[in-house]
């Protein structure tokens, strides 16, 4: 771990340099490929890892090789992963989905911003130096129209977004021919439907049933379509955002790009500090992945941080502000009801959700029902006009394993199920947020309860952390729970970084959290038996057995760390072709010994086979030519 501490000025300057010099970058020995759909502008990005050939025989002067197929993998990095694309953060990303949105002809540009706060910010010329220059003119649904992917799915329409997703979820596995790579253990899927080939119609069907969501605000055309549902690959969310204490716009944009590079399928901007509006605009215009927020955080800032002063009007204005910027999903803590708050009194750690505690305090101060619950239908009307998905927040999630699976937690969950049905009346897409802190033996019940109470809407959990004793290592404690609940059917895992419970994560913390959670998500896909999930593992194992070190590095989730660890003890180029590593050395390498055993067994089999043929030759009289039997 680095011991160098940068000043705030140095951190900001470093982030600014990152942004100014940003260009598309591929991982080592990887290249960006695009798979085209039924129309020319459906170009689905993937990363293809190129592999070296296997030595199969021959001589030193004339070696014989067998080619190894390139391995295609899911890629969340957008244009930042393509060296051929010119990157300019000041201009933002290309508007990939704009032609599809326009072609549907069910939305219209607004003459002015609907949010009074947005109009106030735009009128403040003191913010000109902070403001993103290429602001979009926001759109909303035409009168009487709904523009959500759920609405289209229910109408039987397969959108370009759905076709894009079908291609993306298949991960190019149809390109793989090797039986060794295609081999896969049967999984235990706990009732999930995992077709061998995902079609656009299957995507449409899952969205129509509410089992999956496509977060895709019509005001975020830069995003590449993705899907969240238990019958698809398990996804990972990364949280970024400034606070009143630290971080800047430059640093948050840097963290966004960094997150997508290391595999974030979505990113939540949880900013609570200065310039929340401006920071979010920069993030959205440069994000190839869906962006989520917790609007109550900004609404609280608008009333000077005093929860009791929150009003529906201030919150509604915040929803309009963020929807017209392009936020793809809102976390709404509408299930924290007044009657549930006393249930938390006997907890060890009370209410640990920021949004949950804000709403609980408001309810108790006014002795009124949660205004988010009371105005939930109006929230749905706003979301339906922009296609903002709802992530129904678990404001009463347990903050310690002692509080896991208690009355407050599951009471709120049942209310979220009721709210899910209301949202579906408005064709609004919904996912459900989950815990939290839960010991391993109590995790599966969370998934079972969610499926039953929330009608199979996608589950999105923070971990859960399986023990409370490891501050500084909570990416590990939660990664265990994340792998388990992903296996049981959780659709998206919210990452936890090493800084959880300790401080705001920096760039390296973001990477550590993402790598941990990509491992958890992939382990869950393997356990479920998701078709094609084992291809990369098989390729890695084959490279490992054949001592193809470069391929091992390049197939790793983090090639740079894998290479660095190897090179700590064997830095020479000869170490990249050696048939051992520093763990066992040349004499005790189990794989080298296994290769010898295999070669010996093969030679023995040939020798036994030759002996059998010799015996058979003698038994038939030892004649070189046998007489043909007469008919």
From Swiss-Prot:
Record gene name: thiC
UniProt: Zn(2+) binding residues: 437, 501
Protein name, UniProt field: Phosphomethylpyrimidine synthase
UniProtKB keywords: 4Fe-4S, Iron, Iron-sulfur, Lyase, Metal-binding, S-adenosyl-L-methionine, Thiamine biosynthesis, Zinc
Enzymatic reactions: 5-amino-1-(5-phospho-beta-D-ribosyl)imidazole + S-adenosyl-L-methionine = 4-amino-2-methyl-5-(phosphooxymethyl)pyrimidine + CO + 5'-deoxyadenosine + formate + L-methionine + 3 H(+)
Pathway: Cofactor biosynthesis; thiamine diphosphate biosynthesis
Annotated PANTHER family: PHOSPHOMETHYLPYRIMIDINE SYNTHASE, CHLOROPLASTIC, THIAMINE BIOSYNTHESIS PROTEIN THIC
EC supergroup of this enzyme: lyase
Organism, scientific name: Salmonella dublin (strain CT_02021853)
EC number(s) stated in the UniProt entry for this protein: 4.1.99.17
Main function: Catalyzes the synthesis of the hydroxymethylpyrimidine phosphate (HMP-P) moiety of thiamine from aminoimidazole ribotide (AIR) in a radical S-adenosyl-L-methionine (SAM)-dependent reaction.
Quaternary organization: Homodimer.
């Amino acid at each position: 771990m680095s011991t160098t501490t940068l000043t705030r000025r140095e951190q900001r300057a470093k982030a600014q340099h990152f942004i100014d010099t940003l260009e598309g970058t591929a991982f080592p020995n990887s290249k960006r490929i695009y798979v085209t759909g039924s129309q020319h502008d459906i170009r689905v990005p993937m990363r293809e890892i190129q592999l070296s050939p296997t030595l199969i025989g021959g001589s030193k002067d004339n070696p014989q090789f067998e080619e190894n197929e390139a391995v295609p993998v899911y890629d969340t990095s957008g244009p930042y992963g393509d060296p051929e694309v010119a990157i300019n953060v000041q201009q933002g990303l290309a508007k990939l989905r704009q032609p599809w949105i326009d072609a549907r002809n069910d939305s219209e540009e607004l003459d002015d911003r609907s949010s009074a706060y947005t109009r106030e910010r735009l009128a403040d010329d003191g913010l000109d130096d902070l403001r993103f220059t290429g602001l979009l003119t926001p759109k909303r649904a035409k009168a009487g129209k709904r523009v959500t992917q759920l609405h289209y799915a229910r109408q039987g329409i397969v959108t370009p977004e759905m076709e894009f997703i079908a291609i993306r979820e298949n991960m190019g596995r149809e390109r793989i021919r090797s039986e060794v790579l295609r081999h896969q253990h049967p999984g235990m899927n706990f009732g999930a439907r995992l077709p061998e080939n995902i079609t656009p119609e299957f995507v449409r069907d899952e969205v129509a049933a509410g089992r999956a969501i496509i977060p895709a605000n019509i005001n975020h055309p830069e995003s590449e379509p993705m899907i969240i549902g238990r019958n698809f690959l398990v996804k990972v969310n990364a949280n970024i955002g400034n606070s009143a204490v630290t971080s800047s716009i430059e640093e948050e944009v840097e963290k966004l790009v960094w997150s997508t590079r290391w595999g974030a399928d979505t990113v939540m901007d949880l900013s609570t500090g200065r310039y929340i509006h401006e920071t979010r605009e920069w993030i959205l215009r440069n994000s190839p992945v869906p962006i989520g927020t917790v609007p109550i955080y900004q609404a609280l800032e608008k009333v000077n941080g005093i929860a009791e002063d929150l009003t529906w009007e201030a919150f509604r204005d915040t929803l309009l502000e963020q929807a017209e910027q392009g936020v793809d999903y809102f976390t709404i803590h509408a299930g924290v009801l007044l009657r549930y708050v006393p249930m938390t009194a006997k907890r060890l750690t009370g209410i640990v959700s920021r949004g949950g505690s804000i709403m609980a305090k408001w309810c108790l101060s006014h002795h009124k029902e949660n205004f988010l619950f009371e105005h939930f239908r109006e929230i749905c009307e706003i979301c339906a006009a922009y296609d903002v998905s709802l992530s129904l927040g678990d404001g009463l999630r347990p903050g310690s394993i002692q509080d896991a699976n208690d009355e407050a937690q599951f009471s709120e969950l049942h209310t979220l199920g009721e709210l899910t049905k209301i949202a579906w009346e408005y064709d609004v897409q919904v996912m459900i947020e989950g815990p939290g802190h839960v010991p391993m033996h109590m995790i599966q019940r969370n998934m079972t309860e969610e499926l039953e109470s929330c009608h199979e809407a996608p589950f999105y959990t923070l971990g859960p952390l399986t023990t409370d004793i490891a501050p500084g290592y909570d990416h590990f404690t939660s990664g265990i729970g994340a792998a388990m609940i992903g296996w049981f059917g959780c659709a998206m895992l919210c990452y936890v970084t090493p800084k959880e419970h300790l401080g705001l994560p920096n760039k390296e913390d973001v990477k550590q959290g993402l790598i941990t959670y990509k491992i958890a998500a992939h382990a869950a896909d393997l356990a479920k038996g998701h078709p094609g999930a084992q291809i990369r593992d098989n390729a890695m194992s084959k490279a490992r057995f054949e001592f193809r070190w470069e391929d091992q590095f390049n197939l790793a989730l983090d090639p740079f760390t894998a290479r660095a660890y190897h090179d700590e003890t064997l830095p020479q180029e000869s170490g990249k072709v050696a048939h051992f590593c520093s763990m066992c050395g040349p004499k005790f390498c189990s794989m080298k010994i296994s290769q010898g055993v295999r070669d010996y067994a093969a030679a023995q089999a040939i020798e036994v086979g030759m002996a059998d043929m010799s015996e058979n030759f003698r038994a038939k009289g030892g004649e070189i030519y046998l007489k043909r039997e007469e008919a």
